Each structure stands twice: as C-alpha cells, then as structure tokens.
Amino acid sequence: MAKKLKKNEEITKKFGDERRKALDDALKNIEKDFGKGAVMRLGERAEQKVQVMSSGSLALDIALGAGGYPKGRIIEIYGPESSGKTTVALHAVAQAQKEGGIAAFIDAEHALDPAYAAALGVNIDELLLSQPDSGEQGLEIAGKLIDSGAVDLVVVDSVAALVPRAEIDGDIGDSHVGLQARMMSQAMRKLSASINKTKTIAIFINQLREKVGVMFGNPETTPGGRALKFYASVRLDVRGTTQIKGTGDQKDSSIGKETKIKVVKNKVAPPFKVAEVEIMYGEGISRTGELVKIASDLDIIQKAGAWFSYNGEKIGQGSENAKRYLADHPELFDEIDRKVRVKFGLLEESEEESAMVVASEEIDDLALDLDNGIEIED
C-alpha cells in the first residue's frame, strides 16, 4: 500500500513538473509575441492597491470608500436636471489641477460657464476644452487625449448630448433606433483598455429619462444604452433635496440646496453609501460646511450649545461662523481635514499623530485616576 502511494506521488510530481514547464514555455512565447508584461502573476504587479484622486469633497471621498475616484477607471454621474452633476465634475477638475494634473472637458452640451468653473477653483487658463460637432467627434477627441497618457482627467458632459453624425445629417423626425447606444458601446470597448493603461479618470455625466409604460419598479433610466453602466467602476446618483435659506437680509432667498450623492455602483469599495453636501449657488460644494458637520460628529470639533471649538479654542458661535473661521484659516482647515481622513482610514496616521494620540490617552487615563481618588506613584 505504501509503495502504491509513493508511486502515485511520483507520478503527480512528474505531471506537475511537466505542466509547470509547459506554462513557462507558453509565458515565454506570449512575452515574445506581445511584449513583456502581457501576462503576469497578480502578485508581481508593482501596485496592488487602487490609486485614487480626491473628488474635491470630503463627504464624497468617504462615501466612495477608497478616498476618491479610482485612477484608470470610468465614472458615471447622473441625476435629474439642475441637481449638481456638472458641479460635482468641476470639483474633480479643480482637484486634478490642484494636484498638478491636466484636465480636459468635452462640452457636448455647449453650456459650460467659465465664470462658474473659475469660482469652483478651476484654472480655466489650463483647462482643455472641446465643444464637438457630433458624438463621434467628441468621443474620438476624448480617445486621443486618453491615448496620449498626458491627461489625468477627462470629463464628458453629457452622454445624452453626444448626438451621432447620422442623426445630425438627417431630418427631425427620422428614426435612428439604437444608434447612440451602438456608438457608446463601441466607444466603451475602445476606451476602457486605454483608460486603465494610462491611469486616466474618465467621468461621463448623464441625464435621466423615463421608460414608457412601466407600472412597477423604477421607471428612470439613463440614455446611451447599457454599455456605460457595465464599464463604469463607479456610478453616482446626484439629487438635490431641500433649499438652503440665507440669513439676515437674505432670509427669504435661496442661497443653495442640500444634495445627496448616492454611490449606486462601486467596484473598489462597498456601494450604496450616501454623501450629503451643501451646494451653494455660485460657489459649489461647501467644503467648510461638510468638514464642520463630519468633524463634529466625530468629536474632532467639539460642540457645546451653539459654540464650536477645536483643541479647547472656540472657532465660532453657530455653524455659519465656524465655517467662516475655517475658511479664513486654511492651515486649520487642512489639519482637521487630515484628522477626519485618518479617522476613516483614507490616510495613514503619521508617527507624530500617533504619539499625540497616545499622549492624549495617557492624560485622559491620569485624569480618570485622579477623579477616582487613586494615588499616583512618583
């Protein structure tokens, strides 16, 4: 019996060696024909963690789970009219430029407001802008920019406005069934590999349509077929909720709106998280507003009554004054922002911060011992 088992092991080992040799030969032939790196073991890749770029909104970075938009992936932002889709995309453009990258904006709707983009922090002198005559032209331009490897972010606004050339050349009323869907499907097949290879972030803004005759379920759908839904690694549903009223002389005027951004699809982190932001008219997402709210919930900023304080120092009475204080003190804003990101695991804690946390815990333990009447030895 023992001899039989030993013989079986020898056969298995010999067969395994032959398979390994055959695999090595196949890999060598593939590298010879298609170049080094055409096939590799997953663990051999230099970067296994997904690289991200901040969305420009702290709340959205937290909802995305990875700390921002994944590089080399396709993002779809959709929602009703005037919900803030372009605003969310422009914040990503501003963030890409802030990090030293180059951004391009394919304005198929021919509706980009340069003054509003500048107010959101976009450097309009450095922004690459294209207003294509047809959908094919817009997607071709986006493809060439991505293939160059020199562009970090490409925004297409919007998929619904990417009109096929045949539809433009035809008459109003002509039927063009599935033409746009086929165009988008072909574009996704061509662009997806290049986007991943060049680590470009491609954001597609989309509108909403309603399916006719739907009795049960959600009648809403996005134009452009199903291809974008499949190829997108992240899909964001942007919807405005309640109006934000002003104070003082503007108490009867609407100065912004509360907006919910739901992550309905996420291939790099758990989906279905919701980011609640304030979009102020003419200013975009209130970064100080979301920081005050999130930091207060984490007790990084302490709230006592109407007063907000940080590290024992009062920063404002009421949220509006606290927001204004942080806007006037960018160093403090960055410090609190970093602490929040570390808390959610979006950034690694530095050695100095770890030492400060340990010291703070020791002080708290000492204070607790004194309160309990315990003698502290010298």
From Swiss-Prot:
Gene Ontology, cellular component aspect: cytosol
Binding site for ATP: 79-86
Compartment(s) of residence: Cytoplasm
GO molecular function, one term: damaged DNA binding
Keyword DNA-binding found: yes
Record-level GO BP terms: DNA recombination; DNA repair; SOS response
Domain of life of the organism encoding this protein: Bacteria
Family assignment from sequence similarity: Belongs to the RecA family.
NCBIfam families assigned to the protein according to its UniProt record, in alphabetical order: tigrfam_recA
Protein name: Protein RecA
Species this chain originates from: Streptococcus pyogenes serotype M28 (strain MGAS6180)
Gene responsible for this protein: recA
